[in-house]
């Protein structure tokens, strides 16, 4: 895969108009976009369909979690949207039902392990007797066993996760920040080059591109860093 196949621009924006403006500005430079809750509930689901129909790849970041049948029925309808990736929380029964519902389609199901905004204290406060990396690795094992298409985790855990899941599953890493960029609300971050070196297959970059004075120039700089890392 080239850098352009691996870069996912996060459209974490409040309005459809802002998202459309970013996609227009990035043009053919960016092939892959992430749509999460914020945009999804502001017309983003129809926008996801339109992007997919136009030839772009779409990562629908819905982090599904519900009873088995509800998850399965939701996945069946999401398959019809033509998007490329969908997230679920890494709970075994939900993952297994989703895998069955997506069987035979091109939808890559991604297991969310531990949010990159969480540190060790956050994990403990949530009631887990694990440090973040141990919880990530446990959930990665469960996702692999369930037949999921990939894992979402921070680049800090990417190398350890890759050892567990092998080379075939996607490893999608949010919390990517170019050198010198502010972390924002992310606590476990890494540069694009370091994330690729750690085993990430896809990098999600939001604010460093969409909030940049020149989003196209920002995307090109990140793609150049990724290409350099991939060729090195």
Curated annotation (Swiss-Prot):
Q: Name one GO cellular component term.
A: cytosol
Which terms in the Gene Ontology molecular function aspect does this entry carry?
A: orotidine-5'-phosphate decarboxylase activity
Cite the EC number: 4.1.1.23
Which pathway does UniProt place it in? Pyrimidine metabolism; UMP biosynthesis via de novo pathway; UMP from orotate: step 2/2
According to its UniProt entry, one GO biological process term is: 'de novo' pyrimidine nucleobase biosynthetic process
Does the UniProt entry include the keyword Lyase? Answer: yes
Binding-site positions, substrate: 12, 34, 61-70, 116, 177, 186, 206-207
- The active site annotation covers 63 (proton donor)
Q: Which reaction does it catalyse?
A: orotidine 5'-phosphate + H(+) = UMP + CO2
Q: Which family does it belong to?
A: Belongs to the OMP decarboxylase family. Type 1 subfamily.
**Which purpose does this protein serve, as stated in its record?**
Catalyzes the decarboxylation of orotidine 5'-monophosphate (OMP) to uridine 5'-monophosphate (UMP).
Q: How does it assemble?
A: Homodimer.
Q: What is this protein called?
A: Orotidine 5'-phosphate decarboxylase
Organism per entry: Sinorhizobium medicae (strain WSM419)
């Amino acid at each position: 895969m080239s850098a352009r196949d691996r870069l996912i621009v996060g459209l974490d924006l409040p309005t459809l108009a802002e998202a459309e403006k970013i996609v227009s500005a990035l043009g053919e430079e960016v092939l892959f976009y992430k749509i999460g809750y914020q945009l999804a509930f502001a017309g983003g689901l129809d926008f996801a369909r339109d992007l997919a129909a136009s030839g772009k790849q779409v990562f629908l970041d819905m982090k599904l979690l519900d009873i088995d049948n509800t998850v399965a029925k939701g996945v069946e309808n999401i398959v019809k949207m033509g998007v490329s990736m969908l997230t679920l929380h890494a709970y075994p029964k939900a993952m297994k039902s989703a895998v069955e519902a997506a069987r035979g389609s091109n939808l890559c199901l991604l297991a969310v392990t531990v949010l990159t905004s969480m540190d060790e204290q956050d994990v403990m406060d949530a009631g887990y007797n694990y440090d973040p990396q141990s919880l990530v690795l446990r959930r990665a094992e469960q996702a692999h066993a369930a037949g999921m298409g990939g894992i979402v985790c921070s680049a800090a855990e990417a190398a350890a996760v890759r050892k567990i899941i092998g080379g075939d599953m996607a490893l999608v890493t949010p919390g990517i920040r170019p050198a010198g960029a502010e972390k924002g609300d992310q606590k476990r971050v890494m540069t694009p080059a370091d994330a690729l070196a750690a085993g990430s297959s896809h990098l999600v970059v939001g604010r460093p591109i969409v909030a940049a004075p020149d989003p196209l120039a920002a995307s090109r700089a990140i793609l150049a860093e990724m290409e350099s890392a991939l060729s090195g």
